[in-house]
Design a protein with these regions (language model features):
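Nucleotide donor/acceptor-binding cores
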Residues: 13-14, 81, 154
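Hydrophobic anchor at the start of a short beta-strand
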Residues: 15, 37-39, 128-131, 183
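Rossmann-like NAD(P)(H) cofactor-binding subdomain of soluble oxidoreductases
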Residues: 63-147
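Short, charged/polar "capping" segments at the starts of alpha-helices
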Residues: 46-51, 119-120, 166
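Internal alpha-helical scaffold of NAD(P)-dependent oxidoreductase catalytic cores
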Residues: 101-102, 125-130, 143-219
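Active-site-adjacent beta-strand anchor residues
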Residues: 17, 39-42, 85-86, 111-112, ...
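NAD(P)+-binding Rossmann beta1-loop-alpha1 motif at the extreme N-terminus of oxidoreductases
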Residues: 2-62
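Residues at the C-termini of beta-strands that transition into short coil/loop
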Residues: 42, 60, 74, 113, ...
């Protein structure tokens, strides 16, 4: 896709959420209620979501999305323009099965996963340079089917695997901001990931020792 055409990319984009846990649902609900065409790939939550929608409980305001965009397989969703990947990085081996039905020649991949090397895995697995990365700082927990509780935070540091960063990063950041998702562009995605890792080293063990304090969940 030519950069000159990106201004028209996101308003009409089809977006798939792959990994509908706390992180995927938190961002997906906001994008959907913000007016974007979001399609959720669900497993155990599928029937609940179809019956009563998906809900975000937050001090910033509760949200309910009860649209019809809940799917049990990637083939039902078909090709999209942007895939937001939020499964656990330890399950990356399933992406080879989940993603192909979603991919067209101009599909972008955005990983919101924790850990290092996720962008490289996506690039190598799908032989594409259309890979972006986002480092999430959000305290949220999926505590029952199709329901996420948000305790605080919600910022994404968004970066490109290419140098210089392509204009699509600006387009996605602007779209996320319009949907009330704080999104900052990172000029050095690798440094942002290492910064998050160092943050986690300090607080994740403390959170577990303290009985999984709500404010330390899914940071």
């Amino acid at each position: 896709m030519d950069d000159q055409l990106l201004h028209s990319f996101l308003p009409n984009a089809r977006i798939a959420i792959v990994g509908s846990g706390a992180v995927g649902l938190f961002h997906g609900i906001k994008l959907a209620i913000g007016g974007l065409d979001v399609r959720f790939l669900l497993r155990s939550d599928l029937e609940t979501a179809r019956k009563q929608g998906i809900r975000l409980l937050s001090a910033e305001g509760d949200l309910l999305y009860a649209g019809s965009s809940f799917y049990g397989s990637s083939s039902e969703i078909a090709e999209v323009d942007l895939v937001v990947i939020s499964i656990k990085a330890t399950a990356n081996q399933v992406l080879g099965e989940l993603l192909p039905p979603l991919l067209g020649k101009e599909t972008w991949l955005l990983t919101l996963q924790n850990g290092l090397g996720n962008e490289e895995v996506l690039s190598a697995t799908f032989n594409t340079d259309r890979v972006l990365g986002g480092v999430c700082y959000v305290a949220a927990s999926r505590f029952q089917q199709a329901v996420v509780r948000h305790f605080g935070g919600g910022t994404i540091a968004l970066g490109d695997t290419a140098r210089p960063a392509r204009r699509v990063v600006q387009e996605i950041a602007a779209a996320f901001e319009r949907c009330r998702i704080l999104c900052q562009q990172s000029e050095d995605l690798n440094s942002a990931r290492w910064g998050k890792l160092l943050w986690n080293i300090c607080f994740n063990g403390l959170g577990i020792a303290a009985g999984s304090l709500p404010g330390l969940l899914q940071q």
